[in-house]
């Protein structure tokens, strides 16, 4: 056996590939636990593991236990039900995620610290996230580029996965069924023995398309209507297969290798002659992500970690019917992306009561986009350092953090981002102040886009811009927090100022310009060119200003009764030229509330959870209407039966949208929505878990 371990270790080292692993002990969830852990271990805020109370930068933690109790099965459901500063707008091109008013391209999404790539119109495909393995979700508000680099302007969302080690072999299955064809099925198989671990999972999700009003206004009319089958919510079918291996030959060394494959295809109404809104094709998405890594712990305070990952993603059209000369089953690729990432990080306890982090990141991005005529790649090379020092000041403690990052981008060159934070702690009270800078490197589509198409007889032209500068932000925050075993209360005020925002600007077309455009796109006819009044080009133009405050409360009020309440006020604006306007899709007021009760009688435990989300209107610009606010409440009950030492059954029964709130307005070309619920729905689930010690 020792020979096999040595051979496996030498084989992994000989490949020359860095590998990733996490050394940790799983906390078993006992069905008799009656309180929430209000001081969990987190990693995202500081880059190393520490208790939430001890972090100089506030982090919001969404635990798997809370998600299970609320009956949450999707990633977007977890964020919107539990975090008021987050909103989603689903469509056929992916969910439009927003954090504190800022869109998906300003939010860095990580899985165990590694970037999740693959976007659809700047929206990361959230269906690639394997909820069957989520242990917790850590959300860091505000700029965090000093540690995490590009894209971390609005914040960082880090999904931490679970690799249980308590049982030799365990298997589980979770099924949830609800209205409008909603089905979630997840199966897991885990093996852990003598430092070796194997973790296998498969997840299938599906939902049907629907709309809440069968009518729409005819174009340019606010009185005449016609039937439509264009979905408000786009149905889909998706599968995720994941395999992860871990190996710890000693208590100091851990190795890890993992692979995730994802597949998704939309399920929309087909084209019909008697009604508008159907389509001839579905959108198909595929992703393949694998990573290897290693971590070596010299002692409790000093470690070295190396990670390497490759993430491939592609999407395009798959025709349901013969159309436009394409037979049934034809696949036309729209976009193919590949991201290669390598991280090297050392966590050092050189100075007493201090933690130093130094690291080097390298990332290569490649994009092939048929619609934009792009086949390009770029890279970023970065070095960063951060020192965190704790000082005792009488009975109080002062924690100071200073960090900086240097990035070199192939196109725009050098960039520097600093961070400074202070935390004053006295007993259970924490006072925090943070300044951090953020930046976002222009995407390959924004740099190299070269697009021409004709839509309903009108030509459309868009260009990228190699002279683009990175978008930059300055984030300031003040936080006061009281955290105890039974109560956690915090108030945060912040300001995030963004400059050099990359936007598409329309440029007027005159006769000389029209001729230049015809030379650039020879396929454009003179008749089409004569119809052009403008073309689009990516430019650094707008400024953004986001201010707000957040209130968070979590309490273990009585034995078995827990309450959480969160409120976010967001005042978000953008400036084009000399005019300030409201930031599109921002929400001024939002709140989430959850009350949870659980009790055990012998081998049976009941859990009752009531949760709600309330928000004011969603702002839109131009000719679009603002989307009205809403309030939705959900009720979920779970019933746990510990049938034996080797098995547990947990049926669940819930009602989504208890009060049947629906936006039934007649659709139009200027109408926007915030509430996408089809109304009250019954949700039924069953979780089974079996283990062999």
Regions found by a protein language model. Name each.
Residues 76-114, 135:
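Extracytoplasmic beta-strand/coil segments of soluble accessory domains associated
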Residues 114-141:
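Short acidic/polar hinge/loop motifs at secondary-structure boundaries
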Residues 118-120, 133-135, 146-158, 163-214, ...:
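Outer-membrane beta-barrel translocator/receptor signature
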Residues 166-167, 191-283:
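Periplasmic-side early beta-strands and strand-to-turn transitions of outer-membrane beta-barrels
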Residues 373-374, 410-415, 424, 428-476, ...:
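Surface-exposed extracellular loop regions of Gram-negative outer-membrane beta-barrel proteins
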Residues 391-395, 495-497, 522-618, 689-692:
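Gram-negative outer-membrane beta-barrel transporters
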């Amino acid at each position: 056996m020792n020979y096999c371990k040595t051979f496996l270790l030498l084989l992994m080292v000989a490949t020359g590939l860095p590998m990733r692993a996490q050394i940790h002990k799983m906390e078993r969830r006992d069905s008799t636990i009656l309180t929430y852990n209000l001081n969990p271990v987190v990693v995202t805020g500081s880059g190393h593991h520490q208790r939430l109370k001890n972090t100089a930068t506030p982090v919001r933690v969404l635990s798997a236990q809370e998600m299970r109790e609320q009956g949450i099965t999707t990633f977007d459901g977890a964020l919107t039900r539990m975090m008021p500063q987050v909103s989603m707008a689903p469509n056929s091109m992916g969910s439009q995620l927003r954090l504190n008013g800022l869109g998906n391209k300003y939010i860095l999404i990580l899985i165990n610290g590694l970037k999740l790539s693959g976007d659809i119109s700047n929206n990361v495909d959230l269906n690639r996230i394997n909820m069957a393995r989520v242990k917790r979700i850590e959300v860091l508000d505000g700029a965090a580029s000093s540690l995490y680099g590009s894209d971390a302007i609005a914040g960082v969302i880090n999904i931490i996965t679970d690799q249980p080690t308590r049982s030799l072999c365990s298997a589980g299955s979770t099924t949830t069924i609800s209205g409008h064809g909603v089905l979630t099925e997840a199966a897991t198989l885990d093996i852990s023995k003598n430092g070796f671990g194997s973790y296998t999972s498969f997840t299938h999700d599906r939902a049907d398309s629907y709309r809440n009003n069968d009518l729409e206004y005819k174009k340019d009319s606010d009185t005449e209507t016609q039937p439509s089958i264009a979905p408000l919510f786009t149905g889909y079918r998706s599968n995720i297969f994941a395999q992860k291996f871990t190996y710890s030959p000693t208590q100091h060394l851990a190795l890890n290798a993992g692979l995730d494959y994802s597949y998704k295809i939309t399920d929309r109404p087909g084209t019909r002659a008697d009604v508008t809104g159907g389509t001839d094709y579905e959108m198909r998405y595929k992703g393949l992500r694998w990573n290897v890594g290693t971590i070596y712990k010299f002692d409790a305070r000093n470690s070295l970690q190396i990670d390497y990952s490759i993430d491939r993603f592609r999407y395009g059209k798959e025709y349901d019917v013969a159309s436009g000369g394409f037979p049934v089953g034809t696949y036309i690729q729209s976009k193919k992306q590949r991201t290669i990432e390598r991280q090297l990080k050392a966590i050092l306890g050189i100075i007493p009561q201090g933690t130093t982090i130094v690291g080097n990141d390298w990332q290569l991005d490649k994009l092939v986009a048929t619609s934009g005529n792009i086949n390009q790649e770029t890279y970023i090379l970065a070095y960063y350092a951060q020192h965190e020092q704790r000082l005792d000041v009488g009975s109080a403690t002062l924690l100071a953090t200073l960090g900086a990052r240097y990035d070199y981008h192939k196109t725009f060159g050098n960039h520097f981002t600093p961070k400074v934070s202070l935390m004053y702690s006295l007993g259970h009270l924490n006072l925090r102040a943070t300044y951090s800078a953020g930046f976002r490197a222009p995407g390959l589509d924004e740099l190299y886009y070269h697009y021409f198409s004709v839509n309903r007889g009108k030509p459309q032209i868009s260009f990228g811009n190699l002279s683009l500068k990175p978008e930059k932000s300055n984030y300031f925050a003040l936080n006061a927090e009281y955290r105890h075993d039974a109560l956690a209360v915090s108030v945060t005020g912040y300001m995030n100022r963004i400059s050099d925002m990359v936007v598409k600007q329309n440029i007027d077309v005159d006769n000389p310009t029209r001729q230049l455009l015809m030379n650039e796109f020879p396929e454009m006819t003179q008749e089409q060119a004569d119809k052009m009044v403008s073309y689009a080009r990516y430019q650094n133009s707008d400024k953004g200003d986001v201010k707000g405050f957040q209130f968070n409360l979590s309490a273990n009020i009585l034995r078995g009764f827990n309450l959480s309440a969160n409120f976010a006020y967001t005042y978000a604006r953008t400036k084009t030229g000399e005019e300030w306007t409201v930031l599109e899709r921002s929400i001024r007021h939002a709140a989430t509330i959850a009350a949870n009760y659980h009790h055990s009688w012998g081998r049976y435990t009941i859990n009752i959870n009531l949760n709600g989300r309330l928000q004011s209107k969603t702002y839109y610009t131009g000719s679009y209407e603002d989307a009205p606010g809403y309030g939705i409440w959900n009720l979920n009950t779970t019933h746990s039966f510990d049938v034996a030492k080797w098995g547990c059954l947990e049926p669940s029964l819930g009602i989504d949208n208890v009060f049947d709130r629906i936006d039934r307005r007649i659709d139009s070309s200027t109408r926007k929505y915030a509430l996408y619920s089809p109304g009250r729905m019954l949700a039924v689930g069953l979780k089974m878990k079996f283990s062999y010690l």
